[in-house]
């Protein structure tokens, strides 16, 4: 899946990120739908002419979300540097090579599915804007929210205040927005005239995107927020608001506004940006 243009607007935190395309592999399962495709169009389409983005898509990559500090001045690796980076990163992440036996409650390497390669273009981060490939400095309000959330998790009086990913309510890569992570980097998309359904493998969250709605529901606030979609030419644009306080991305507030875009690059590659 391609993560290409990230735009996150929040109260107290404003990020303007462009996240580079992470190619999704060809869908392994495609729901049965009538497909209409012209001889000069490589993009699969439904009978109504809309791009057919349905299928199960893979968005794994070991390209870091943020550029590592030791690569601060390097935007793109050479082919040789990319191979060296992949070898070193795969070696570093291989749990079977760990010698520290004091850790409990962790997995061995068998359970991880991060992928083994960086993006084809050799970029050193998914973030492309800011130019340094890193998330901008948090505002005071965002830092305060982070401290409060960390304290709440450390001093939890009951399971109700433990992190959602720990309780398997929301997956840590399912978002929204979706970001490659340790495993379960797969998402299924299903289209109808009224809805687009986004089904993440991680914890099996299903997010309905309303295609014919004109306004967002303010209550109840939901884990995945309230999503409304529209087509602009061949690009699906999804706007999401009214997140639950516990699920706001990147230490933002529950007033976070998220815009995502999906588009077909070719028959086997889906573009995704947020």
Task: Describe these PLM feature segments.
Residues 2-274:
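PEST-like low-complexity, intrinsically disordered acidic/proline/serine-rich tracts
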């Amino acid at each position: 899946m391609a993560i290409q243009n990230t735009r996150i607007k929040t109260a107290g935190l404003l990020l303007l990120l462009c996240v580079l395309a992470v190619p999704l592999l060809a869908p392994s399962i495609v729901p049965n739908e009538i497909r209409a495709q012209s001889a000069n169009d490589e993009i699969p389409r439904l009978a109504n002419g809309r791009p057919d983005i349905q299928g199960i898509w893979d968005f794994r990559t070991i390209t870091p979300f943020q550029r590592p500090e030791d690569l601060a001045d390097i935007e793109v690796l050479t082919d040789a540097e990319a191979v060296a980076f992949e070898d070193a990163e795969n070696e570093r992440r291989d749990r079977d090579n760990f010698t520290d036996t004091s850790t409990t409650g962790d997995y061995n390497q068998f359970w991880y599915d991060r992928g083994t390669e960086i993006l084809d273009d050799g970029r050193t981060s998914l973030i492309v804007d800011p130019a340094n490939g890193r998330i901008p400095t948090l505002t005071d309000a965002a830092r305060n929210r982070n401290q409060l959330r960390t304290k709440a998790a450390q001093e939890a009086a009951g399971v109700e205040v433990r992190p959602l990913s720990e309780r398997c309510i929301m997956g840590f890569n399912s978002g929204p927005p979706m970001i490659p992570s340790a495993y379960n980097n797969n998402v299924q998309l299903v289209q109808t005239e009224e809805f687009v359904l986004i089904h993440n493998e991680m914890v099996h969250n299903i997010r309905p995107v309303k295609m014919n709605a004109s306004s967002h529901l303010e209550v109840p606030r939901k884990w995945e927020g309230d999503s409304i979609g529209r087509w602009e030419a061949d690009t699906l644009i999804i706007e999401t608001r009214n997140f639950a306080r516990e699920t706001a991305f990147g230490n933002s507030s529950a007033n976070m506004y998220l815009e995502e875009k999906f588009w077909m690059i070719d028959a086997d590659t889906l573009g995704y940006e947020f």
